[in-house]
């Protein structure tokens, strides 16, 4: 047979026929002859299509350089190196000034092809959208969380582990992640505050929640110390920030500053006055079902005396607010530990709050001391946002599981070194946290 050695021939005389096609499957040969694309060709075509879609997607990133301690400045610097035109990276703390002077990078974009990323806390999202609305409708926004609570980011699926360095500082992966995201909406609410005996009104806007009482007191104490230049070093780590919140909440645990808050506040929902439990020390109006760093306040709440059939499921785009009550600083701590539940009180589209005395109030983590008077809350508009697709969330979960399942401790010496390194880091963090707690306690309770 032509191309095959004769029986008994030396091994060196073995030849391979030039017509052998074993490396080219017959099924693929048939596809090629028929003009149909192979699996490999379809995959290449799909990648080409995705690359074309990514190329047509413009990205503008707003970074709060003051968020996350030193992290904000680092993110701003690295993103400016990673992203090339037509993509843009702007400092969110200087956005208003850039708009005032007509900077085209801050004032021009194609709403059909542009997607935005805000790197910062929930408050940064509000500041950026308020500034952009002075020019035109903002593009859909995703969030890279750098703040303390990051509740809006959690609701939209942008958890801390989504924006690792490999995704955030890689232009192709960042653009692809934003392009693949689903466009949705989040309600924005208008708060009109009037002091007793005065006609002027102060207007604020929020997207997440409004708190009155014990939670706002802790936020106000935290914000006061954070703005003091002497203690700026305390806020360089997320773990320290959370501990400081707990320290400030401890004051109200000891003093019960808002005992019988139900007598100091009258709340009317859709023109109907609602009642609160007698031990209420905090009232929270929720637009999203996440509070204080991920506590699911509405879906996990006790039904109270109203029963299961009265209330509907919480949604961020349904034009309604959910009102819950908490019973003190200890209750807030238990909520964060997921060992207690708030109490469902009401659900509605318009809320009027009468404050009979000066009380701390906070919206989206921005606190202030509100004088006695009235607060009127009503629907304002909808903010276009980007949600992490469920399929991508599932892929992230599977990736984490596979990484955990395939990880090992390495060799014995390497494992010992790793354990020692982790111990040293843990010891340093523990020392820093203790020092921060002591400084905060001494400052606030002195």
Feature-to-residue mapping (PLM):
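Catalytic core of DAGKc-family lipid kinases
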Residues: 60-77, 82-104, 109-112, 117, ...
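Terminal signal-anchor or tail-anchor transmembrane helices
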Residues: 15, 424-446
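ATP/nucleoside-binding phosphotransfer catalytic cores, i.e., glycine-rich phosphate-binding loops
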Residues: 262-276, 285, 293-417, 423, ...
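C-terminal helix/juxtamembrane-tail motif
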Residues: 70, 83-84, 89-101, 383-410, ...
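Short hydrophobic beta-strand segments
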Residues: 57-64, 352-354
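N-terminal chloroplast transit peptides
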Residues: 1-24
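N-terminal organelle-targeting presequences
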Residues: 27-59, 411-413, 444
């Amino acid at each position: 047979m032509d191309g095959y050695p004769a029986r008994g021939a030396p091994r060196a005389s073995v030849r391979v026929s030039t017509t052998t096609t074993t490396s080219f499957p017959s099924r693929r040969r048939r596809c090629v002859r028929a003009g149909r694309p192979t699996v490999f060709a379809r995959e290449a075509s799909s990648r080409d299509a995705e690359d074309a879609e990514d190329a047509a997607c413009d990205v503008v990133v707003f970074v709060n350089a003051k968020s996350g301690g030193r992290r904000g400045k680092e993110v701003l610097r690295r993103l400016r190196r990673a992203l090339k035109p037509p993509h843009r990276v702007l400092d969110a703390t200087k956005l208003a000034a850039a708009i005032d002077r007509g900077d085209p990078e801050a004032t021009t974009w194609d709403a059909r092809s542009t997607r935005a990323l805000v790197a910062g806390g929930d408050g940064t999202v509000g500041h950026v959208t308020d500034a952009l609305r002075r020019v035109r409708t903002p593009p859909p926004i995703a969030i890279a969380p750098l703040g303390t609570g990051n509740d809006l980011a959690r609701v939209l699926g942008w958890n801390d582990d989504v924006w690792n360095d490999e995704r955030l500082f890689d232009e192709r992966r960042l653009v692809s992640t934003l392009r693949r995201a689903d466009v949705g909406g989040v309600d924005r609410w208008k708060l009109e505050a009037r002091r007793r005996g005065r006609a002027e009104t102060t207007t604020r806007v929020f997207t997440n929640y409004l708190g009155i009482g014990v939670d706002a007191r802790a936020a106000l104490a935290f914000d006061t110390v954070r703005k003091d230049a002497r203690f700026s070093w305390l806020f360089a780590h997320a773990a320290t920030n959370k501990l400081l919140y707990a320290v400030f909440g401890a004051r109200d645990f000891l003093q019960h500053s808002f005992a019988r808050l139900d007598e100091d506040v009258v709340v009317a929902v859709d023109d109907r006055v609602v009642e609160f439990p007698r031990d209420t020390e905090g009232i929270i109006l929720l637009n999203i079902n996440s509070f204080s760093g991920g506590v699911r306040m509405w879906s996990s709440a006790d039904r109270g005396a109203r029963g299961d059939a009265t209330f509907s499921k919480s949604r961020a785009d349904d034009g309604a607010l959910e009102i819950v009550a908490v019973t003190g600083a200890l209750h807030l701590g238990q909520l964060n530990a997921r060992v207690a539940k708030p109490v469902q009180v009401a659900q509605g589209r318009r809320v009027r709050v009468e404050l009979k005395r000066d009380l701390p109030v906070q919206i989206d983590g921005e606190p202030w001391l509100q004088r006695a008077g009235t607060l009127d809350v009503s629907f304002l508009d909808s903010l276009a946002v980007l949600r992490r697709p469920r399929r991508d969330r599932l892929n992230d979960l599977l990736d984490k599981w596979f990484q955990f399942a395939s990880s090992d401790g390495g060799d014995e010496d390497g494992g010992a070194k790793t354990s020692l390194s982790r111990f040293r880091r843990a010891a340093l963090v523990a020392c820093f946290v203790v020092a921060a707690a002591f400084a905060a306690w001494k400052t606030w309770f002195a």
